[in-house]
From Swiss-Prot:
GO biological process: cell wall organization; peptidoglycan biosynthetic process; regulation of cell shape
Pfam families given in the database record: MurJ
Name of the molecule in the record: Probable lipid II flippase MurJ
Family: Belongs to the MurJ/MviN family.
Main location: membrane
GO CC list: plasma membrane
Function: Involved in peptidoglycan biosynthesis. Transports lipid-linked peptidoglycan precursors from the inner to the outer leaflet of the cytoplasmic membrane.
Keyword Transmembrane belongs to the record: yes
Organism this protein belongs to: Synechocystis sp. (strain ATCC 27184 / PCC 6803 / Kazusa)
Length: 533
């Protein structure tokens, strides 16, 4: 809504709501992944699901996720308008988007086999058959993703942050219930060939059912907020519709380029045994804290960026951009230190049970470490993209993403043979680093200077502190293994907690000595939250 109509909630309050709600969702997501890992390990069923989920899952994250282009476009436009203008605008955009995505759903159902063959030409016949069936079951998520993304955007614009952040747990609950009952009844038999089809259908069906529940959960709150009801509206001449599409279409295409990169990664991964499953498990562990923190940073900052788009407000906009980048570094770098230094014990704690054995843990751990190295570049890129959206420019991110397709393919080709699965992940890290660098250069020119010398100096200090903290945790873990070994889950958990604490202490002392201004800002926010609790 317009600034005058918005709630007076502070950035810290919004970030706190989003963080707590997202944390709850991520806990359920972690439980879902643990059940999947215990039931199927890194074998045939999970590999098939990893490929079948690529298109519907990507659409669900891209279009239906918080901070996606649909969410960002709606927030950017509605935050500048009065509430009475919202309902017809939202209903019109929903009608238009639903028509397009219904067609996409039909295409996915009819062409499932073709899409799987394009994504993974190296799959075994049985794995391919399961992947095709799973894709057909999950195809409706294409339509649901658009409806959910629009709903999230409208609820955020109405100053409602809890439901959009917590509703993803519904997608986890349905999978947990379905697989949980199957594991309870069948045990390890579920991962034997006679039950592979049942397991794959439970995975796909539970995922789709969760998406349906997620959409249904937002309909009533959206209507009560006066942000549109479930009705068709064809008033495409509304001025706001054009404004939304001017941001939404380039942003969707730009983000869609990431899908092409992801599909390219999986194309090369199909020639490496168990690579897709290893990437799925490693990616989830990295994305769990990343998702929580990215929502804390991106959700409250996007409306702020939008309200500072006028040239006379650019001095404050540049300050906010720096804050977004530095807060990303201060929150991501300690996680990078932990995931890189403690990759093996972390994977053992989270996944090593049932069908997921020590050999599977050894496959996933280096992949997790590689994802950990790229966390800051992923989040920093997203912060900068939101600045372009706030400025009404979806074309610049699109052009960069278009070039990144070729860069990602080249890096995948160069890295996948010598480095295996880790090489594919590092190709993605390289692409995100390149994107972030280009976006900073473009904004520096567009906003007449960003004081990049100061940025580089402070980021350099934080990188050094991160390296020292990670080495401290890694060496501490090696010493722990020599002195006590690890003979149980409890001992493994104690090792991870102890070494993570050492890493955080070293990092905290290091950043305090580095005297980065945003350290005090982050500390003040955390202290205020602690006092409220």
């Amino acid at each position: 809504m317009s600034p005058s109509g918005k709630s007076s909630r502070s950035l810290a309050n919004i970030a706190g709501i989003v963080a707590i709600a997202t944390l709850i969702s991520k806990v359920f997501g972690l439980l879902r992944e643990q059940i999947i890992a215990a039931a199927f390990g890194v074998g045939t069923v999970v590999t098939a699901y990893a490929y079948a989920y690529v298109i519907p899952g990507f659409l669900f994250i891209l279009l239906g996720g918080i901070n996606g282009p649909f969410h960002s476009a709606l927030v950017s436009v509605l935050s500048k308008r009065d509430r009475e203008e919202a309902a017809p605008l939202v209903e019109t955009v929903t009608t238009l988007v639903s028509g397009v995505l219904l067609g996409v759903t039909i295409i996915l159902v009819l062409g499932a086999g073709i899409f799987i063959d394009l994504l993974a030409p190296g799959l075994e016949p049985e794995t391919r058959r399961m992947a095709v069936q799973q894709l057909q079951i999950m195809a409706p998520m294409a339509l649901l993703s658009g409806l959910i993304g629009i709903g999230f955007g409208t609820l955020n614009a109405a100053d409602q942050y809890l439901l959009p952040s917590i509703s993803p747990l519904l997608s986890s609950i349905t999978v947990i219930l379905g697989l949980g009952v199957a594991v309870w009844q069948l045990g390890q038999q579920l991962n034997t060939e006679p039950y592979w089809l049942l397991g794959s259908l439970l995975l796909a069906g539970g995922t789709t059912a969760g998406a349906v529940l997620q959409w249904l959960a937002q309909i009533v709150p959206q209507a009560k907020a006066g942000m549109g009801k479930l009705r068709l509206r064809f008033n495409f001449a509304l001025p706001g519709v054009k404004e939304v599409l001017q941001v939404m279409i380039p942003a969707t295409l730009s983000s869609g380029m990431l899908y092409i990169n992801f599909a390219t990664n999986l194309f090369f991964a199909s020639f490496i045994p168990n690579a897709a499953a290893a990437m799925r498990y490693g990616n989830f562990v990295a994305l769990t804290p990343l998702g929580i923190i990215s929502n804390m940073i991106l959700v409250p900052f996007l409306p702020v960026f939008s309200r500072l788009a006028d040239p006379q407000d650019w001095p404050e906009l540049k300050l906010r951009i720096r804050q977004g980048i530095m807060l990303s570094a201060l929150t991501m770098f300690p996680l990078t230190a932990i995931l890189v230094g403690l990759a093996i014990p972390i994977v053992q704690v989270i996944y090593e049970r049932g069908a997921f054995d020590a050999e599977a843990a050894a496959e996933v751990a280096p992949v997790l470490a590689a994802y950990g190295l790229g966390m800051f570049f992923y989040l920093g890129r997203d912060v900068l993209v939101r600045v372009f959206y706030a400025l009404g420019d979806g074309n610049s991110p699109f052009k960069v993403s278009l070039f990144n397709i070729f860069l990602n393919g080249l890096l995948d080709y160069l890295f996948y043979k010598p480095f295996g699965t880790v090489g594919i992940v590092m190709a993605t890290v390289g692409v995100n680093l390149f994107s972030m660098t280009i976006f900073i250069w473009m904004l520096n020119r567009r906003l007449a200077g960003l004081s990049l010398g100061g940025w580089a100096m402070d980021l350099g200090k934080l990188v050094g502190v991160t390296a020292i903290a990670s080495v401290a945790g890694w060496q501490g873990s090696v010493l722990w293994q020599r002195l006590w070994g690890v003979n149980s889950l409890v001992e493994n958990i104690l090792e991870v907690l102890t070494m993570s604490s050492i890493i955080l202490v070293v990092f905290t002392v290091g950043v305090a000595l580095a005297k980065v201004p945003e350290v005090d800002l982050l500390g003040d926010r955390l202290w205020k939250k602690f006092k409220r609790v």
